[in-house]
Regions:
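Conserved N-terminal glycine-rich FAD pyrophosphate-binding loop of Rossmann-like flavoproteins
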Residues: 39-62, 206-216
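Rossmann-like dinucleotide-binding core of oxidoreductases
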Residues: 19, 25, 30, 136-260
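Single conserved hydrophobic/aromatic residue that forms the stacking wall/gate
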Residues: 301-309
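Short beta-strand to alpha-helix junction loop
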Residues: 69-87, 251-254, 284-294
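Catalytic cores of eukaryotic secretory-pathway lumenal/extracellular enzymes that build
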Residues: 62-68
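Beta1/beta-strand and adjacent pyrophosphate-binding region of the FAD-binding site
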Residues: 3-15, 170-174
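Rossmann-like flavin
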Residues: 39, 91-95, 103-105, 203-205, ...
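Feature captures the FAD/FMN-dependent oxidoreductase FAD-binding
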Residues: 74-133
Length: 309
């Protein structure tokens, strides 16, 4: 690598942090990591809604060189993931190369260099720009007639208002992708009434999210035991089967996953009318699957009302 190249990294989420670490590993220090927020973490910083959980196994949602034996569950809750990336950031002293509150507003490629403009008027020139901005950091509010005149509280899931007490409020959740389903599963029984508005029903894959005991967490500090726990062959086989199922709806994997989704709905939702509302009009895997073992029980035991919208 030419040592005189000026490098800029935009975004201090998991990709930006990794890029900075790898530059330092190669003894390259002529770079700056720019982050528009006041702390690192990317999507795990921006999202903090109730029930936030990763649908990738905890031990696989880490850098290969920074294993974390302290995960509390097989699928980690959002706050733990945020803490993990913040700890890695500190361990590698990346704060020395980072500027917070620096939002990029423009980039122009002039004479083989990037001319970068920031929201505060600052300008930077770089030979190389590594874009690590992600795609989910600009909340999209639905365009609903009358939304501007709504007199109650309204906010996007990525801007959760934790100071708001929901116990005596009627709450409506719009959307039934992963975020909406996780929120409803977490809010069941926590508010006066709960309504879930869905445009189309979703197929649900059960998510067995076991808790790691303190003994297991201690054992995971042994690299050999950690490698055994990660079950690389089984995990990547499952990933490959899922990918193949998406490409071939007639494959054995696709049929198996479809049957799991259908059985999950039948076994957990006995009410015929409610089951009709929750049955999609498309085959499983036509859309990205939602993974949850909390949603159906929440509907049954806390009586949130799914509404088509």
């Amino acid at each position: 690598m030419q040592k005189d190249l000026r490098i800029v990294i935009i975004g201090a989420g998991m990709a930006g942090i990794l890029a900075a670490i790898k530059l330092l590993e190669n003894n390259y220090k002529n770079f700056t990591l720019y982050e528009k927020a006041d702390q690192v973490g990317g999507t795990w910083r921006d999202n903090s809604y109730p029930g936030l959980t990763c649908d990738v196994p905890s031990h696989h949602y880490t850098y290969s060189f920074e294993r974390n034996p302290a995960w509390s569950r097989y699928y980690s809750p959002g706050p733990e993931i945020k803490e993990y990336f913040q700890n890695v950031f500190k361990k590698y002293s990346l704060q020395e190369y980072t500027q917070f509150g620096a939002e990029v507003k423009s980039m122009d490629f002039i004479s083989n260099q990037w001319h970068i403009g920031f929201a505060d008027g600052f300008n930077e020139i770089a030979d190389v720009v590594i874009g690590a901005t992600g795609v989910l950091h600009h909340p999209k509010m639905p365009d609903i007639a009358g939304i501007d005149s709504f007199q109650g509280h309204i906010f996007h899931s990525s801007k959760w208002q934790h100071e708001l007490e929901l116990g005596n409020l009627n709450v409506g959740v719009i959307g039934n992708g992963s975020s909406g389903v996780q929120i409803v599963g977490a809010l069941g029984g926590e508010c006066k009434s709960l309504f879930h508005f869905q445009r189309t029903a979703q197929w649900m894959m059960p998510l067995d999210n076991g808790i790691f005991s303190s003994e297991e967490q201690v054992a995971f500090q042994d690299p050999k035991i950690m490698n055994e726990a990660m079950q690389f062959d089984e995990y990547f086989d499952a990933v490959n089967r899922y990918s193949q199922a998406l490409l071939d709806m007639e494959s054995d994997g696709a049929k198996e996953m479809a049957n799991i989704c259908k059985d999950n709905l039948i076994e957990n939702v006995k009410d015929v009318e409610l089951r009709k509302k929750l049955t999609p009009n498309h085959r499983p895997l036509c859309k990205r699957l939602v993974w949850s073992s909390d949603y159906y029980p929440c509907l049954l035991y806390t009586s949130p009302s799914p509404r088509d919208s």
